[in-house]
């Protein structure tokens, strides 16, 4: 069974799956480990499951044990990993592409609706106990009959 180091705490279902598939080393306290700690914890491992909070720069990658064959990034991108340094060490790097595409679109719609209906102002007013009715209080913009286009930028 392949041994992997998982740098950050995952949801229970993911940790259970990792336990069935691999011999995992978990970061049970979900601490943001230093680069030297990541190097130390990955000794004897075949792979590392990083998150976007882990800086895997050239110096860190160059110091990883020779047993490391893969860095899997628990993120959509690779901004935290020096891909060229990994390539020079023949370390495969993967990510989780498109896993957040639908969620990102949904949050975009949420933000549009919240802005049009002045949701943040309403929440703040309710928290402060300042909810004062009037015909035009926090009326916002009604979207019924509005044509809306959403363009992706990623």
What are these regions (language model features)?
Residues 1-94:
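An N-terminal-biased, well-structured beta-alpha scaffold segment characteristic
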């Amino acid at each position: 069974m392949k041994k992997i180091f998982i740098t950050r705490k995952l949801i229970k279902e993911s940790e259970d799956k990792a336990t069935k598939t691999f011999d995992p080393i978990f970061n049970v306290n979900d601490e943001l480990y230093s680069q030297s700690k990541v190097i130390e914890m990955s000794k004897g491992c075949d792979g590392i499951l990083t998150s976007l909070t882990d800086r895997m720069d050239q110096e860190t990658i160059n110091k990883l044990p020779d047993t490391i064959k893969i860095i899997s990034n628990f993120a959509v991108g690779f901004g935290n990993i020096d891909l060229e340094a990994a390539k020079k060490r023949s370390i495969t790097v993967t990510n989780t592409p498109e896993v957040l595409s639908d969620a990102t679109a949904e949050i975009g719609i949420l933000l549009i609706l919240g802005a049009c209906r002045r949701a943040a102002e309403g929440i703040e007013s309710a928290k402060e106990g300042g909810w004062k009715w009037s015909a035009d209080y926090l009326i916002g913009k009604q979207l019924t009959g509005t044509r809306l286009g959403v363009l992706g930028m990623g």
